[in-house]
Amino acid sequence: MTGLRWAHQAARCVTALLLASCAGPPLTLYTLYTLGPALDAAPLGRRALVIEVSRVSLPNAFDTEDILVRHGSVLRRSAQGRWASRLSSGITGLLAARLAQRRPDALVTVQPQIEAPAYRVLVNISQLDVTAEGTAAVEADWQVVPGNLALSPQRYRGAFSATGAVATDQDVVTLEGAVLDQLAKRIGDVSLK
């Protein structure tokens, strides 16, 4: 009986060791932007200009938590890295943060407000690719809808690209962030002067 008990114990130990040896590296979560040090911004006041950035629209294949790299017609996801949230949410946050940097006089938010905002920014990304060759590309169109219904919405579109390393997940995140920063800059330059 003790021999059988010993065999079961040994089998459990071997199974545990095999499972532990099969475990991969720990999962790393990434965001598109980092928060800088808190600035001593002046209070906005009761009638501050409010700019609401609506959730960005992306093709379904890309609106995931997976970090994707295109190899020809194949999308490969990272085994070790993920976005901390769905990509559309991360891009929305990035755009709002960049617009807030450009417009310190305004409250730039991704949250709906009680009163209608002075401007609502709606962004549709039709293409967002990072290739194994190290090229990131974004094609987008966007509207700036004034809160004043007597004014017409402004419509824009643009294509942006950047090149860089894609050897690691951090490289992919940095490259994707660079091309999305170009989009944010263009939105701020032409839409919200």
Residue ranges and their predicted role:
Residues 1-22:
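Sec-dependent bacterial lipoprotein signal peptides
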Residues 23-41, 102-149, 164-166:
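Surface-exposed short loop/turn segments
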Residues 50-56, 68, 120-124, 137-143, ...:
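Soluble periplasmic/extracytoplasmic beta-strand elements of cell-envelope proteins
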